[in-house]
């Protein structure tokens, strides 16, 4: 017998050369591969169970009283072991005839130290079976020619996922025993060993059982891998052979530490072509940058370091250019025609022009600090629940007019954007004649828009509710129920919190000038609206609402009409709206011409709107105009004491100007389909006249100061999100009427 071992072989093949006549094809030819983990035939179940029933009998010493038959059987088993130990390994690995070459199960799983078990199984099989000498290999698995052929080369076994490598030391005895059919092997071996005892002999049977139950002498445990039945020790990753990726699967801590110390040099020595190309490209870019930013400037340096010497030039003109074109040196606009420098008052006297703005300078902007006289706030006018956001972008000057543009542009989660300008704390005046020339937006018969030209006392800033809380629209100089919350009336005539800066404010409380009732009354030059006929018989017509907003209120909001004049009942009438719990409105409405609007089939002209007032308690009056025609006059006596309140004088506060274009459901029904966005409210000029002997222009007059008080409460005038006086961190001043 000869035994050769080819390390490239994957499947061990057994070839037994003997002088004895062996007719068993299972040993004379290459063994057909089959799954060593396949099910055994039913006739072998008892034998298989016995072969694995004991693990202690493998190393038992020879019994001193064993019979000759037992001794003979033992010698025969050792003889068979000698034959198996000289097994000749098969073809090279690339040409093996196992499972992966035929598409079937791999061949025998060879393991050193297990051949003694197989020899015992063979000798035991010869004692038990004498008749099946030439059993086909295909019947070993118990199928015996049936459709359940476990050696079908096109049907791989259930657990045979990897071929058994030649020379592997870690194939378990379990797989070998289940693969080598003990019954068939014993039958074939019995045919060539006639001297062995029969299976009926008790002694022989006992010896055979001991042989079958002997376990493998393999030093490796019979553990199992998670890959379906193979012992974990035979998993291919544990095979001791070199592969290109072994350094990934079996890292070497020593080599890794050495690599970390010299990572750069190691990578530099072992870089591939791609890495080399990247390195070369980086070097080229570095050299190019060095050449462009260092070498080239150094080569082209001219050495010019001579200091600058002023150049002399010829004076072409003696004209003195202004530093800034927007800066005005006079309150009267230079573009105002001289014919407008004077205005005839109600009593026939001529009042002089004290302020004007013709808006002839193109491209003026009105962001905070941009303009001398007007500022466009960036706020939502929440006092009247407007639907637009006032944005400085919507205000500019062009073609000699101030343009307030409203468009359907989403802004700050509102769907409309428009413009407002106000002269708060920049330009104020006390009594006089205010005249504004304007062209109203959209059509004259479409309701919904709210154009406004108005004025308000400087102690309140329009749109900043914290500043107006308790001062708007008060014009009151008494210490009685008129200064208390709700006017001390339970009937709901007033929801106002009371006059914050009243005449009887306690000492130590903040007040602009203690002892004088202060407030922020409102006088509207015009609030544009449209008169509609509910019957539908008359066409809609634009009207101008001209009002005095005041507090505290008369009973039922009705003043003494004996001191009110209307000049043309065909176009003007007293407003049916006289006020509400937040203000009393002494108002009249005047019909407007359709040609004074932006759109329409007729001409689009500008019209003047204004008011004139004197605040003397005895001779004072307030008169409104549309064009040069007066529409309504209210005398001071119309605001005499009523109920539990006293006189409400015409405003002595410094009044600031407000020009705006709004839209709100609180004002009028909005005819959305008929509004042609964008719409523009255009103002041609603003002019203020005063009696020559009573000129009072400024926001901080001596007798009615505002500056110090505003500075003491500046957050109320700069933060539109503060909606009440107390939200600004202040408390209402105490007064002597309630108790100091």
Swiss-Prot record:
It is found in: Golgi apparatus membrane. Residues 39-48 have a biased composition (Acidic residues). Glycans are attached at residues 399, 445, 486, 568, 593, 721. One of its GO terms (biological process) is fungal-type cell wall organization. SUPFAM superfamilies: Concanavalin A-like lectins/glucanases (SSF49899). Residues 1-275 are cytoplasmic. Keywords: Cell wall biogenesis/degradation, Glycoprotein, Golgi apparatus, Membrane, Signal-anchor, Transmembrane, Transmembrane helix. GO terms for molecular function: glucosidase activity. Involved in the synthesis of (1->6)- and (1->3)-beta-D-glucan polymers of the yeast cell wall in vivo. It is required for full activity of beta-glucan synthase in vitro. It may be a beta-glucan synthase, part of a multiprotein glucan synthase or a modulator. Belongs to the SKN1/KRE6 family. This is Beta-glucan synthesis-associated protein KRE6. The lineage of its organism: Eukaryota, Fungi, Dikarya, Ascomycota, Saccharomycotina. The gene is KRE6.
């Amino acid at each position: 017998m000869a035994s050769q071992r080819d390390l490239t072989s994957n499947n061990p093949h057994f070839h037994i050369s003997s002088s004895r006549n062996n007719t068993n094809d299972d040993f004379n030819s290459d063994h057909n591969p089959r799954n060593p983990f396949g099910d055994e035939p039913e006739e072998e179940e008892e034998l298989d169970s016995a072969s694995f029933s004991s693990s202690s009998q493998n190393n038992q010493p020879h019994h001193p009283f064993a019979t000759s038959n037992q001794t003979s059987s033992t010698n025969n088993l050792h003889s068979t072991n000698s034959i198996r130990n000289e097994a000749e390994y098969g073809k090279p690995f690339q040409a093996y005839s196992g499972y992966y070459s035929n598409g079937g199960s791999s061949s025998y799983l060879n393991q050193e130290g297990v051949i003694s078990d197989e020899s015992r199984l063979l000798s035991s099989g010869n004692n038990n079976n004498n008749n099946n000498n030439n059993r086909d290999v295909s019947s070993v698995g118990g199928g015996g020619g049936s459709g359940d052929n476990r050696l079908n080369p096109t049907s791989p076994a259930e657990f045979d996922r990897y071929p058994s490598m030649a020379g592997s030391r870690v194939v378990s005895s379990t797989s070998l025993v289940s693969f080598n059919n003990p019954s068939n092997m014993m039958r074939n071996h019995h045919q060539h060993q006639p001297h062995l005892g029969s299976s009926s002999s008790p002694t022989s049977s006992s010896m055979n059982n001991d042989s079958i139950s002997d376990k493998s002498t393999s030093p490796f445990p019979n553990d199992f891998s998670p890959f379906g039945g193979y012992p974990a020790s035979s998993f291919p990753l544990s095979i001791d052979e070199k592969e290109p990726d072994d350094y990934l699967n079996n890292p070497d801590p020593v080599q890794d530490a050495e690599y970390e110390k010299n990572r750069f040099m190691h990578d530099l020595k072992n870089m591939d072509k791609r890495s080399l190309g990247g390195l070369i490209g980086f070097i080229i870019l570095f050299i190019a940058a060095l050449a462009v930013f260092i070498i080239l400037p150094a080569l082209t340096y001219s050495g010019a370091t001579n200091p600058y010497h002023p150049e002399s030039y010829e004076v072409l003109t003696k004209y003195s250019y202004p530093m800034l074109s927007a800066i005005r040196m006079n309150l009267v606009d230079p573009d105002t025609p001289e014919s407008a420098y004077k205005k005839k008052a109600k009593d026939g006297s001529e009042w002089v022009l004290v302020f004007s703005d013709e808006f002839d300078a193109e491209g003026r902007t009105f962001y905070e600090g941009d303009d001398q006289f007007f500022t466009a706030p960036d706020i939502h006018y929440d006092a009247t629940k407007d639907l637009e956001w006032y944005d400085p972008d919507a205000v500019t000057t062009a073609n000699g007019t101030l343009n307030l543009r409203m468009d359907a542009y989403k802004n700050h989660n509102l769907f409309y954007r428009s413009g407002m300008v106000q002269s708060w704390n920049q330009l104020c005046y006390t009594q006089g004649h205010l005249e504004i020339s304007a062209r109203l937006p959209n059509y004259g018969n479409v309701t919904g828009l709210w154009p406004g030209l108005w004025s308000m006392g400087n102690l309140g800033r329009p749109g900043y509710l914290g500043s107006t809380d308790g001062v708007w629209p008060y014009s009151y100089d008494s210490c009685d129920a008129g200064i208390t919350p709700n006017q001390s009336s339970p009937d709901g005539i007033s929801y106002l919190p009371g006059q914050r800066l009243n005449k009887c404010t306690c000492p130590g409380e903040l007040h602009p000038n203690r002892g004088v009732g202060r407030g922020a009354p409102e006088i509207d030059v015009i609030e544009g609206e449209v008169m509609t006929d509910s019957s539908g018989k008359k066409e809609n017509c634009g009207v101008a609402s001209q009002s005095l907003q005041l507090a505290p209120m008369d009973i039922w909001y009705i003043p003494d009409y004996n001191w009110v004049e209307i000049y043309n009942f065909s176009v003007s009438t007293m407003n049916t709206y006289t006020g509400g719990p937040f203000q009393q409105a002494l108002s009249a409405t005047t019909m407007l011409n359709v040609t004074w609007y932006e759109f329409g089939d007729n001409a689009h002209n500008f019209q003047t709107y204004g008011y004139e007032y004197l605040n003397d308690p005895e001779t004072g009056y307030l008169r409104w105009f549309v064009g040069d025609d007066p529409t309504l006059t209210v005398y001071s006596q119309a605001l005499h004491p009523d109920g539990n309140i006293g006189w409400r004088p015409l405003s002595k506060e410094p009044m600031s100007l407000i020009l705006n274009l709004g839209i709100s459901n609180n004002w009028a029904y909005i005819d959305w389909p008929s509004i042609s966005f964008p719409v523009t409210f255009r103002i041609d000029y603003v002019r203020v006249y005063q009696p020559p002997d009573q000129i009072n222009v400024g926001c901080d007059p001596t007798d009615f100061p505002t500056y110090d008080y505003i500075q003491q409460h500046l957050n109320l005038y700069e933060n539109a999100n503060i909606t009440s006086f107390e939200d600004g961190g202040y408390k209402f001043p105490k007064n002597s009427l309630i108790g100091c």
